Each structure stands twice: as C-alpha cells, then as structure tokens.
Amino acid sequence: MVSWMICRLVVLIFGMLYPAYASYKAVKSKNIREYVRWMMYWIVFAIFMAAETFTDIFISWFPFYYEIKMAFVLWLLSPYTKGASLLYRKFVHPSLSRHEKEIDACIVQAKERSYETMLSFGKRSLNMAASAAVQAATKSQGALAGRLRSFSMQDLRSIPDTSAPTYQDPLYLEDQAPRRRPPIGYRPGGLQDSDTEDECWSDNEIAPQPPVRPREKPLSRSQSLRVVKRKPLVREGTSRSLKVRTRKKTIPSDLDS
C-alpha cells in the first residue's frame, strides 16, 4: 500500500506536472529543439499510461512492480538517459510510420460510423419519445372517459344540496334564524295535494272528508236566455189613499141633484 502511494506521487509530480511546465517554457521560448524533445516525451508517456491501465489489473501482484514503474518514469524524464527520445526513435516512430495509412483509415471510418450511429440513435430516441407521449395521452383520455361514464344520474342526485354559507350578524340573529322547510306537497294557500297529504300524515291523523256531491245538470241554452219577470210590489197605503180621494170628489155631485 505504501509503495502504491509513493508510485502515484512520483508519476503525478515527475511524470505529469514537471513535463507540463517544461513544455510551456519550450512553447514560450520558441525553442524548436526543446519543443521536439517534449513532444516525443508526451507521445511515449501516453503509450505508457495506456499500458499501465492493463498492467495494474493483471501484473500488480508481481514483486517490486511499483518500484519498477517509478524507476521507468524517472528513466524517461532524465536528461542524462533521454529514455523517451530513445524509445520514440527506435520503436514508436518506425511502427507508426508503417501503419500510418491503416490508422488514418480506421480513424475516418470511426468518425463516419459514429456520426451515423448518433443520427440513428437520435431518430430512435425521438420516435420512442413520441410514441410514449401518444400512449400517455390515450391512456389519460380513456381514464377520463371512464370516470365520466361512472357518474350515473342516481349518483348525481345523491349529491347533497348544500346551501352556500352566509354571514350571520350577531345583532340580528332572530331575523337571520333559519326557517324550517315546509313538508313535501305544501302549498302557500293552505292547499295540499291529496297524494302528498297521505304521505305526510298517517291514517289516524287524516281528517274525514265529506262525501262529494254530484254536480247539477248544466242549464240549457234556452233556459239561460229566459229572464224571470217579477211584478212590482205595490204598497197598500198608496192604494187606500187613492180610493179615499176618489170618494171625496163624488160627494158634491149627489148634493146638487
């Protein structure tokens, strides 16, 4: 464990940070010789990092593995040994020059295939998203229609008729007292339907009703047009006064004769 931590520190400091600063100085000074040297180092170090990924998995159990790795990084970086330039000139450059065309063709094919795969993946994802949205919309519509159908007329009639809440003034509680609802079939004139009257009251409480009289025959048209003429009543006093007056007039005629 200690050797692994020391190895990681050596690779981080001497394998990455110091070469990065030296490359910056070479680019700034525009020294072509130093620029080429550090470019060769970075190529070799990239290959070393790729190989290290697999060797740490399969060969890390080998004794003195981390010590050998630290020594190899220092050998690549040392200006006395110039291990990076040596490996590049003898192994890396000849192998890359031999397989350069094949590597370029593979890179071009990889770019084209990656572009095509990205397009196909994007189309599939859009189709899947559209189908999912359509299915969700249809399911929601079906659920809404089912809920609306479940409400029958009986369910709607069974909803209690709750009146809206009203504000009650504490000073006028008597005027605002709720009135009792009249019984079913009640009419404001004191009249009630016969059917509702039987429903509201029991048999013992119902008042006995008089028998219904048969209706008289309607008058005919001729009878309705006749007018009954009555003789005017003559007072007895007036008739007697008239008789007396007539008698008084006839008396002097008898005396003359």
From Swiss-Prot:
The modification Phosphoserine is found at S152, S194, S202, S253. One of its GO terms (molecular function) is microtubule binding. Its main location: endoplasmic reticulum. Signal peptide: none annotated. Residues 159-257 are annotated as: Disordered. It is found in: Endoplasmic reticulum membrane. The modification Phosphothreonine is found at T196, T250. InterPro entries: TB2_DP1_HVA22. The chain crosses the membrane at residues 1-21, 42-62. One of its GO terms (biological process) is cell division. Microtubule-binding protein required to ensure proper cell division and nuclear envelope reassembly by sequestering the endoplasmic reticulum away from chromosomes during mitosis. Probably acts by clearing the endoplasmic reticulum membrane from metaphase chromosomes. This is Receptor expression-enhancing protein 4. It comes from Rattus norvegicus.
